[in-house]
């Protein structure tokens, strides 16, 4: 089946909304993927000047190294962008970024006392950062995505030795 036909079928079943949930381990390039996808496949097709500038401002931060950059799920752009796929086919597109599953060697989820505790919209009390990241990632896929995209890495882009083997082992737990 052709990609356009698949998207058309999905959009038909979802009232024209196609939300791409981007998940995977922390520091694997999820935010970088979203930023690049938006720059190449979405922003050029936004006709309204103010909406285009707003979408650019809403792009996620990305960076090199071991520090976790995304600390909560985020819809990008905040409001879905209507895109004309052909004469009779419009879709509303937005991506959903998430923290991702914590991997050993990543920085930012622990402090001097151990794993940081954070407040989330899903629990009344604070929970461990890694648990919040796991819950948020699961919610992105189960509750907010039409299509799920899994980003993985061999660890070479984030300077975390053994990122693949650790992530691979955790995935099988």
Over which residues does each language-model region extend?
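Conserved ATPase-coupling elements of RecA-like P-loop NTPase cores
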Residues: 105-106, 159-163
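Short secondary-structure boundary/capping elements
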Residues: 2-3, 14, 129-133, 165-166
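Flexible loop/turn segments at secondary-structure boundaries
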Residues: 29-30, 157-159
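P-loop NTPase catalytic core
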Residues: 79-85, 94-96, 134-140, 149-155, ...
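Conserved G1/Walker A P-loop phosphate-binding module
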Residues: 2-118
């Amino acid at each position: 089946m052709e990609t356009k036909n698949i998207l058309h079928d999905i959009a038909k079943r979802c009232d024209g909304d196609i939300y791409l949930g981007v998940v995977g381990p922390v520091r694997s390039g999820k935010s970088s993927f979203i930023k690049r996808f938006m720059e190449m496949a979405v922003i050029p097709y936004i006709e309204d000047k103010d909406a285009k500038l707003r979408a650019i401002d809403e792009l996620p931060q990305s960076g090199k190294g071991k520090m976790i950059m995304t600390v909560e799920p985020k819809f990008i752009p905040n409001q879905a962008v209507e895109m004309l796929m052909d004469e009779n086919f419009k879709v509303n597109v937005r991506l959903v970024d998430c923290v991702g599953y914590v991997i050993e060697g990543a920085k930012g989820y622990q402090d001097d006392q151990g794993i940081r505790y954070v407040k989330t919209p899903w629990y009344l009390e604070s929970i461990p950062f890694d648990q919040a990241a796991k819950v948020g990632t699961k919610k992105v896929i189960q509750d907010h995505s039409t299509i799920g995209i899994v980003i993985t890495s061999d660890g070479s882009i984030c300077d975390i030795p053994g990122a693949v083997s650790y992530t691979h082992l955790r995935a099988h737990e």
